[in-house]
C-alpha cells in the first residue's frame, strides 16, 4: 500500500512470510517490523482482508508512485501483479470499495508505530 504525500510517498510492504516494512521515499522507514507480534497480527489481518477484494484489482505491469492524496495498492502473486488506486479521503471515509483494505493497512502502520515506541529492555 503506497500513499502519496506532498513531501514523500509512504510504502507499507506486507508479505505472506510475515515480513513487514515501512519505506519513506525521502529516506528512512522501519524494516523487520513483522517480528513484533501485534504488527504481525495486523499484517495477517491486512492479507486476509485484501484476499477478499482481489476481484477489485486489475492486472498491471506498471508500478507508478501515487499522486499526492492518492493510495495505490499492489498485490504480488507468483504469476501477476495486481493494482488498484483510490483517493485517500474516499478510502478513509468508507466511500470506496477498498476502504476495508485501506483501514487494515492503517492498522498495520499503527501497530508499527506503537511497537517502535516501546522502551527497549524495560517493562513492556
Please give the residue ranges for each predicted region:
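N-terminal domain-start interaction segment
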Residues: 1-31, 66-80, 119-124
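Short, well-ordered, aromatic-rich surface patches in folded extracellular/luminal domains
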Residues: 70-124
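Long, charged/polar, surface-exposed segments that mediate recognition or autoinhibition
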Residues: 27-55
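A short, sequence-level motif marking secondary-structure junctions
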Residues: 16-18, 38, 87-92
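Surface-exposed patches in mature extracellular/periplasmic domains of secreted proteins
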Residues: 57-65
Amino acid at each position: 500500500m503506497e500513499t502519496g504525500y506532498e513531501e514523500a510517498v509512504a510504502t507499507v510492504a506486507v508479505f505472506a512470510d510475515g515480513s513487514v516494512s515501512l519505506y519513506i521515499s525521502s529516506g528512512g522507514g522501519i524494516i523487520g517490523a513483522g517480528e513484533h507480534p501485534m504488527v504481525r497480527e495486523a499484517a495477517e489481518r491486512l492479507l486476509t482482508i485484501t484476499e477478499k477484494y482481489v476481484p477489485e484489482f486489475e492486472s498491471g505491469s506498471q508500478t507508478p508512485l501515487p499522486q499526492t492524496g492518492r493510495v495505490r495498492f499492489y498485490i504480488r502473486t507468483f504469476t501477476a501483479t495486481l493494482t488498484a488506486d483510490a483517493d485517500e479521503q474516499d478510502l478513509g471515509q468508507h466511500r470506496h470499495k477498498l476502504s476495508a483494505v485501506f483501514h487494515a493497512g492503517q492498522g498495520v502502520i499503527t501497530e508499527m508505530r506503537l511497537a517502535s515506541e516501546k522502551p527497549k529492555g524495560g517493562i513492556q
